[in-house]
């Protein structure tokens, strides 16, 4: 376990060094997200982002391990990350379920330790965790899709065909919410993608 974390830290430092090579010592501001997503987590992220700017950080690293939480706060966190002036990276140290998946997809790069999971973003209601009506699922699918699409796409010409290649596949993001979306090689039509 310690070796895996050490390898990740070394890889991340190399990634930041290559990206921000003009700085001899890039400043990485780490924000831990290791509880359910809610109003406290949202305020914690806002404070961390302000502190990163005040300390002239080069980027933010979210260290994430969450089973999810409130869609409302997750949407606020997603929007803040998408609009933030510094790059925001996420290291998933076990779980980025549900609301955590939405937040992770908003980040500039996603890093995961071996055996970590991301996905299972179906909206649930009440204490029993039953699936919310399709109105809510539709909105969450749209949010996941738009977040993935926000990272852009490349136009590739192959054998006189023009292909669109998404940097983050919006269908994969939607499949984390809707079991009817099939991603070849990942999930069948009876499973939510994780």
Question: Where are the model-predicted features located?
Answer:
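Soluble extramembrane regions of membrane proteins in the secretory/endomembrane system
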Residues: 22-194
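Bacterial N-terminal signal peptides
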Residues: 8-17
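Bacterial N-terminal signal peptides that target proteins for export
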Residues: 1-8
